[in-house]
Amino acid sequence: MPTLQKAAASIDDTVEGAMSATLLSLLGVTAKSEKGAAGTNDKVEWLRSQLIGKDVEFDTPFGRRALTYADQTASGRSLSYIEDYLVKQVLPFYGNTHTDDSHVGSKTTRLVHKAASYIKRCMGAGAGDALIFCGAGTTAAIKRLQEIIGVALPSVEMRNRLSAQLRAEERWVVFVGPYEHHSNLLSWRQSLAEVVEVGVDADGLVDVAALRRALGSPEYADRPMLGSFSACSNVTGVMTDTREIARVLHQHGAFACFDFAASGPYVKIDMKSGAADGYDAVFLSPHKFVGGPGTPGILLMNKSLYKLNSQPPSTCGGGTMAYVNGFNEEVSKQIKHHCQDTLYYDDIEEREDAGTPPILQKIRASLAFWVKEYVGYDTMDLHERLFSEMAMKRLLHNPNVMVLGNTNAHHIPIFSFLIYPSVTVKEKPFDAFGEPSCDKQLETMKHKQLSLHGRFVTRLLNDLFGIQARGGCACAGPYGHTLLNVDNELSLCIRSAVLEGYSGLKPGWTRLSFSYYLSKEEFKFILSAIEFIATYGHRFLSLYKFDWITGN
């Protein structure tokens, strides 16, 4: 594979101001280069060769194990390809942006602008869309949108006071789906908005009929409305039909916003702003992309959602204003100059990028997008459909494994499961008359009524096999209640126990991912490990001590 270092030799030869220029033209590579001609398997093999940590080993209670990573839904893996480029080609010329007067300032500013332009192109953004980099992931992106539309509040006390003063037609109504990560649910609940939670239908999918009814309710008429739905469950991998949801929301005058944190690394995201089935805002966590750790969160939004044009930006700081007076607004009133003390930029992307921007993080994010585009959606889909079908077939046929969610729905290969171990029970046989027989005791297999703790299974995957998975509720507690059939009474009992300090009683599961760049050997190894634990995992219980306080 050609290196980015060689390709980057053309950076300084790039024609300034060329309308078609992208970050990739700065790097001297495009999707149609010789990389694009490589075969599907060659691309994935190359990607695996660049994974940082692919040959790492670590010590476990059972000896040294090779690390096998299957926690891509939580965070992706870094790539030598990207990190080497940053170290050798960006950092030597690194300088703060907001200036063209120095070589490093000019070059860094240019790279950052090209990085943003390339990401917008990959996401189908148009002239009416704004890209804002926020914090470290989707959580910050959602919070930024809440600040922009004026519903974010610093405290619950302030929320209660202000909510009572708002007229009904002023208060936002926000519709959320059943799969939501806590970041796309709790922050809305704590905002000024009225939150309407849409549940699942009989198939465990978003109840679109219920959404239609809620949107058409007279109590929400003439009020600003917004839907904020997960594009894919980070627990089950079940995909939401975002186009259908967008159409339904738009038909009722609501904005359509989607959280692509779980599926963003693998699916095409096309804003289609202004279309009936287009998106008005997308939240994204590029750190979940392969090559993405160390990237910022992304909010791509239609400018019609921006409510701060005549006000200061959501965060004030350097690089957001055109001019600041030597006196503040109160002084200007005293001297009869009724004007604001600060002139902020009109451009949304400039005014919402206060202070030193996440320079390396933005460039790294664009490179992670490039890797995604280079591998190609057909390649990713082919590998993931194969992994999903094979994994589902083996796991569903194992009587000790229960895969959560609708296993027939369209989904990406994110699997959350419970293990109900079978145990050998010795029973005395009976004769034809129902009397105890003198024959030798028979051994029968019976299934326990309780599953192994999700975090215990995760520890066994780690300790026995070196497999990195995740135990718990995956920050999707309300959806977990649905999946595990936890009713209100049981939920309150669990809450009471947690209040007493027993966090270990919280229900959960084991989750892992079969990302497209796993090797076939790794894929089969992970499945075999699950099957081993499903058969023998309970025998290791005596070797572990459970902490009811922490859940460790």
Language-model-derived ranges and their functions:
Residues 2-552:
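Pyridoxal 5′-phosphate
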